[in-house]
Curated annotation (Swiss-Prot):
PROSITE patterns: PA2_ASP, PA2_HIS. Its cofactor is Ca(2+). Coiled coil: none annotated. The active site is at H63, D105. InterPro entries: PLipase_A2 (IPR001211), PLipase_A2_Asp_AS (IPR033112), PLipase_A2_dom (IPR016090), PLipase_A2_dom_sf (IPR036444), PLipase_A2_His_AS (IPR033113). It comes from Gloydius halys. This is Basic phospholipase A2 B. Residues 1-16 form the signal peptide.
């Protein structure tokens, strides 16, 4: 299911905050997000279950939790405004929902950067079937 969602996004073109999130990750980590994070571990990409495999996968778990806490927002499609100031992401705009989505994406991009040294290639295309069915709580 996760793979189909990612392929659909790639075929249709990325819109809204997904494109902005991709740009944040690329700038913070130097990695191409679709290749490096779209299928990483048990939580990166669409959906997630089980225990995060490592610190990078935990970044995705926390990001999913952040999105879950947003009410009345469409975090994958609502575009937001942000800028870079002295190497830091600054979320802007007047819409509180869009600003919160930006803050979730910002936190994840920073988390990916901070955990680059623990990134494991073996989790890049980790099969969902190997993730346990019982998920951690946010």
């Amino acid at each position: 299911m996760r793979a189909l969602w990612i392929v659909a996004v790639l075929l249709l073109g990325v819109e809204g905050s997904l494109l902005q999130f991709r740009k944040m990750i690329k700038k913070m980590t130097g990695k191409e997000p679709v290749v490096s994070y779209a299928f990483y571990g048990c939580y990166c990409g669409s959906g997630g279950r089980g225990k995060p495999k490592d610190a990078t996968d935990r970044c995705c778990f926390v990001h999913d939790c952040c999105y879950e806490k947003l009410t009345g927002c469409d975090p994958k499609w609502d575009d937001y405004t942000y800028s870079w100031k002295n190497g830091t992401i600054v979320c802007g705009g007047d819409d509180p929902c869009k600003k919160e989505v930006c803050e979730c994406d910002k936190a994840a991009a920073i988390c990916f950067r901070d955990n680059l040294k623990t990134y494991k290639k073996r989790y890049m295309t980790y099969p969902n079937i190997l993730c346990s069915s019982k998920s951690e709580k946010c």
